[in-house]
Amino acid sequence: MDYLPVFLNIKQRDCLVVGGGEIAVRKIRLLLRAHARIHVVSPAISEELSNLLLQSPVITHTAESFRPDHLQDRALAIAATNDHEVNRAVSAAARKAGIPVNVVDNPDLCTFIMPSILDRSPIIVAVSSGGTSPILARLLRSRLEALIPSAYGRLAEYAARFRDKVRQRFIHQENRRFFWERMLQGPFAEMVFAGRDQAAQDYLSEALENSTDQFPTGEVYLVGAGPGDPDLLTFRAMRLMQQADVVIYDRLVSPAILDMVRQDATRIYVGKVRNQHTLPQTSINELLVKLAQEGKHVLRLKGGDPFIFGRGGEEIETLSQHHIPFQVVPGITAASGVASYAGIPLTHRDHAQSCVFVTGHLKDNTIQLDWPALARPNQTIVVYMGLLGVTELCRQLIAHGLQATTPAAIVQQGTTPNQRVLTGTLETLPDIIQQNPLKPPTLIIVGNVVKLHQKLAWFNSTSEPMGTSSGPGYP
């Protein structure tokens, strides 16, 4: 470790910034956030810095070239000029005076360096590459942004407010640690994140009253995992995935996403392959209730969005009947995510003014849909779970008025490295699929917007425009 990470209290302390340009302004704004008094030394300053001087009474400016006596009584110094000799002089003088000094973009002249900062005050996270690659440090910070929501600052304020009460309630440090670990990772934290301040305060007070390891009923997180690409997960989904005790998942959750769940969480697979459910839906509902009543934090992870053909509504109805706390986290539904990765806009001014989502499950070799409504012109049809019923689907759409030459596409495992796009028409698509076996999950898109696929496809996947021997896939 080349540097010792420390946090320096410079509130109401005098700090020197040498320089008057854009780089100096960035450092000054950072010092302002730490409530420092700032003394700027520079023969000339930028318009932006001039405006900052007018806005902030804690900034003063001396229109001179740097001299060592400018360092007198300063807590730290920052050299932010584009003149190497000036920067070297500031560094040498500060070192001689025993004052911490930072020279922007020159670690060799620094006695301290400025990290990339994630500010969730009073929580502060600093990331540093030791001056070797500031860009890499910023990239790492951006990853942390996804894992540490802004509400963590409020959570820290709550912890500070109750710290003395917790210390009085729990004599032994180990018990205090256990208490705070449960509070800061459980329902209390989620209440704070959701802005339910009174409920959070009541929950914490009740936990203190009980002062045992027995906590109230658990909670269920109904989370949409999106169409497959882990990068499409929401911040909230990622956070809840890391604090679950148990995860209940099905086939539509990709392995890459499942790998992001807390490693020591118990995993329960509930199937959801057509006609081969490992557990029927009623049993899944009952399992969620049972686990939550045991005090567990249960992650119900569903592909896509839990409220779009995901039966999420049925599950939370059962939870509500049993007074089980729950949260619902939306996910990017397959229609939106897969179409985007396939380069097929679902609406387009020249091609489609409406879009409809339907499920293509076969029942007794038929699909029960409002066919006249689906066969309207200037409309995009997105069919979930339609692979086995594609022949019936295309036949009915043609029978109810759509042209046989209407463009159609089927996308295999969209948004993942295994994505594959086949395009054709209502007339040709069943034969195309017959000749090119696909692996579920798949999504079917019907409408003139499919014509745009070849032009707009951007994701690195297999794309195969196809038709029959009599002609191209579509006009």
Curated annotation (Swiss-Prot):
Pathway where this protein functions: Cofactor biosynthesis; adenosylcobalamin biosynthesis; precorrin-2 from uroporphyrinogen III: step 1/1; Cofactor biosynthesis; adenosylcobalamin biosynthesis; sirohydrochlorin from precorrin-2: step 1/1; Porphyrin-containing compound metabolism; siroheme biosynthesis; precorrin-2 from uroporphyrinogen III: step 1/1; Porphyrin-containing compound metabolism; siroheme biosynthesis; siroheme from sirohydrochlorin: step 1/1
Region ranges (Uroporphyrinogen-III C-methyltransferase)? 218-475
Q: Provide the coiled-coil residue spans.
A: none
**Which CDD domains does the record associate with it?**
SUMT (cd11642)
- Disulfide bridge map: none
For biological process, the GO terms are: cobalamin biosynthetic process; methylation; siroheme biosynthetic process
Q: Where does NAD(+) bind?
A: E22, I23, P43, A44
Functional summary from the UniProt entry: Then it catalyzes the NAD-dependent ring dehydrogenation of precorrin-2 to yield sirohydrochlorin. Finally, it catalyzes the ferrochelation of sirohydrochlorin to yield siroheme.
Protein name in the entry: Siroheme synthase
Q: Give the species this sequence originates from.
A: Nitrosomonas europaea (strain ATCC 19718 / CIP 103999 / KCTC 2705 / NBRC 14298)
